[in-house]
Amino acid sequence: MPPTTPTDPGTPADVVTPADIEDAAARLKGVAHRTPVLRSRTLDALVGAEVHLKCENFQRAGAFKFRGAYNAVSRLSRAELARGVAAFSSGNHAQALALAARELGSSAVILMPEDSPRSKKDATLGYGAEIVTYDRYNGDRADIGARLAAERGLTLIPPYDHPHVIAGQGTAARELIEETGPLDALVVPVGGGGLIAGSAVAATALSPGIRMIGVEPEAGDDTRRSLAGGERVRIPVPRTIADGQAVEQPGELTFAVNRRLVESVVLVSDDEIRAAMRLAFERLKIVTEPSGASALAALLAGAVEPLPRRIGVVVSGGNVGLDRFLELMA
């Protein structure tokens, strides 16, 4: 049986609209957490600007991914829910989809890299999902995931390249700007591009003139290269501590949005990410995973130029095990 996908997938010309994000927000109300926005005088002084941190590390399943996963699964028919869902993910979408499926009375099968953090695998299993592993350096996860879904008749929910997922992710930026008012810039981690795409649609509607700035690890600069060249570029599997951003190529739909709405993508080193994680822990009293700290790292490293006056930063997740956190901080 061929894999099914949620209906009305949209087109690259009109992937997600502000109305789609409003609809997603209504679906997520009372289900997803309205995560806090953190301010710190210490951080403002270090950066030289007014910084507003949207703390998605406090989201259900530990990251922003729950927003998109729940929005997508909530749109499935009863028959699709009964058959179950599938996904490929390095960890955060895996946990999010497993939880969303459980909440909506469905089941989930997740394709994860063999070297995914143990904490992310354990959490995914804890939400009731089945895990199938693959070698991320020698296998194409999209192809393997599609075959897995086809063999089992499951609905495949991709981690970023679907309009319902993108719209769900955009609700985080919507909440942020509702709380802060207009911002001069929004700095967002970039993996496959779903978070910044949804954020850009929401933010440019609510705060006209806002600068959308993406952040990638130095080893995983596929979106930066793609935006510079005007077409999607594929790179070797990135080797970086930011496992949630170890993506080879931007999504087709996410790239269509981001090439239109994102001003620039800046890069940060693994050491700069570690430094941001340490500062978040020691001074802000929050735990972030490497990918979750990359946008903060860009500000602390002075990578965002010219420096805006009022800046929003998405702390995208906090799914890191204690042993791994201590190893990174050593």
Q: Residue locations for each model-derived region?
A:
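PLP-dependent amino-acid enzyme catalytic core
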Residues: 1-330
